[in-house]
């Protein structure tokens, strides 16, 4: 049977003889998807998270990772939660740095979804999800979006971890996580600090590049905080749409933010991603997917 499963699924036979995977809580998984996800999709994502947590168990057994520094901000509004977190993490109002490495530096485990093909078969694509397991926070991301969109996804999941650590996915929780992400990536004070009222398109594009967000998101945020008029916002959107920013990000970032944890493993002489795949019984490509060794697709 193990040999048949090995052939069918591509896993090494050793995977099927490993001890049962520790069961990450179903209730604590917060899903970011285009629509309400079905039980089948949740099960597929849960299977991915079980393997993902095992990947990090292996990492912790061979490497020293940063200590946990993630506060419980469940009683705060999104704006206040961001202000507190940015202060605790010494970010001020500056553009947020590499979010994968920022999360890793605070003890949050970030990994790819891994079982993308299985999730694709459910016809309910999941962008990302987060959970707490055994006192440790995890973010799993599919990297389906642009690099700028991926930063919003990570900020959204960070918001879920600090504001709703034990709550299931609800429209209200998702809305608050979106508000958290917008404020975390583009603090309202930064809009007043770095931009004039009714900024020109050129200034807006400089701003969005500095803060590593999409032009559409930057325009929306500037309007939300009252830094431009309704008419000016409409005009900015019209021009951005004409220039193709509604469906893509012309001149945007051409690479995803890299993981310091997995890049360290990839360049390590003693332990490698191949060693990780072998010891865990995983297909090499699946291990690379969990390790965020992905590239932008050409479309």
Q: What is each stretch, according to the model?
A:
Residues 1-299:
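Active-site hotspot residues in diverse enzymes, especially metal/ion-binding acidic/histidine motifs
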């Amino acid at each position: 049977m193990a040999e048949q499963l090995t052939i069918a699924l591509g896993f090494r036979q050793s995977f099927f003889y490993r001890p049962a995977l520790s069961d990450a809580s179903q209730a604590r998984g917060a899903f970011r998807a285009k629509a309400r996800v079905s039980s089948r999709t949740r099960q597929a994502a849960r299977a991915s998270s079980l393997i993902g947590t095992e990947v990090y168990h292996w990492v912790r057994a061979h490497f020293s990772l940063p200590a946990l520094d993630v506060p419980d901000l469940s009683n705060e509004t999104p704006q206040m939660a961001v202000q507190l977190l940015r202060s605790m993490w010494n970010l001020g109002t500056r553009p947020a740095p590499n979010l994968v490495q920022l999360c890793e530096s605070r003890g949050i485990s970030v990994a790819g979804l891994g079982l993308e093909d299985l999730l694709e078969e459910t016809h309910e694509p999941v962008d990302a999800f987060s959970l707490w397991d055994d006192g440790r926070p995890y973010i799993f991301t599919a990297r389906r979006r642009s690099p700028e969109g991926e930063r919003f996804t990570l900020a959204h999941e960070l918001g879920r971890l600090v504001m709703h650590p034990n709550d299931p996915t609800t429209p209200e929780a998702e809305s608050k996580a979106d508000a958290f992400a917008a404020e975390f990536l583009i603090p309202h004070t930064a809009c007043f600090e770095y931009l004039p009222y009714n900024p020109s398109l050129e200034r807006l594009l400089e701003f969005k590049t500095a803060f590593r967000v999409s032009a559409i998101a930057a325009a929306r945020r500037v309007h939300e905080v009252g830094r431009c008029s309704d008419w000016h916002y409409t005009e900015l959107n019209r021009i951005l749409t004409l220039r193709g920013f509604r469906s893509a990000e012309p001149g945007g970032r051409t690479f995803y933010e890299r993981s310091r944890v997995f890049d360290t493993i990839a360049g390590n002489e003693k332990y490698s991603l191949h060693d990780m795949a072998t010891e865990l019984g995983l297909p090499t490509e699946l291990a690379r997917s969990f390790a965020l060794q992905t590239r932008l697709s050409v479309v």
